[in-house]
């Protein structure tokens, strides 16, 4: 049994910490929503063959478009396939790196446990 005045062990300091944690969580949630909107609008370029093939994706890796130079068509199907694959990988890698950087910016300084 607890002594008089001890309650459940939640002093004002603990309540303030809890309130601060909720405030930080709300800030992260709002920031994440803005970040998601920004990532959707981004256009990140991956290219290959000196620009013969360009792949554009959003900041959250959604394909937006593929641009293929007429000169790339003359290279044949196998080479064209390789060029598209390389450009896609480059666009994807740039996009994931951008997303990671933006997420780190969002959560930096928040002192979240486990991050």
UniProtKB/Swiss-Prot annotation:
Keywords for the protein's UniProt record, in alphabetical order: Cytoplasm, DNA-binding
Record flagged with keyword Cell membrane: no
Pfam families: YbaB_DNA_bd
Highest taxon above the source species: Bacteria
Gene Ontology MF terms: DNA binding
Matches recorded under InterPro entries: YbaB-like_sf, YbaB/EbfC
Gene3D superfamilies: Nucleoid-associated protein YbaB-like domain (3.30.1310.10)
Subcellular location: Cytoplasm, Nucleoid
Example of a GO cellular component annotation carried by this entry: bacterial nucleoid
Oligomeric form and interacting partners: Homodimer.
Record HAMAP family: DNA_YbaB_EbfC
Protein function: Binds to DNA and alters its conformation. May be involved in regulation of gene expression, nucleoid organization and DNA protection.
Family to which the UniProt record says this protein belongs: Belongs to the YbaB/EbfC family.
Protein's UniProt name: Nucleoid-associated protein Npun_F0448
């Amino acid at each position: 049994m607890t002594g008089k005045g001890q309650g459940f062990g939640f002093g004002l300091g603990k309540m303030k910490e809890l309130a601060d944690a909720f405030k930080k969580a709300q800030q992260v949630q709002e920031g994440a929503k803005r970040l998601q909107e920004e990532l959707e609008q981004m256009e990140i370029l991956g290219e290959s063959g000196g620009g013969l093939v360009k792949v554009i994706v959003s900041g959250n890796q959604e394909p937006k478009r593929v641009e293929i130079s007429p000169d790339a068509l003359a290279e044949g199907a196998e080479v064209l396939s390789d060029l598209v694959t390389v450009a896609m990988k480059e666009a994807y890698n740039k996009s994931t790196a951008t997303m990671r950087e933006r997420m780190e910016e969002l959560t930096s300084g928040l002192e979240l446990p486990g991050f």
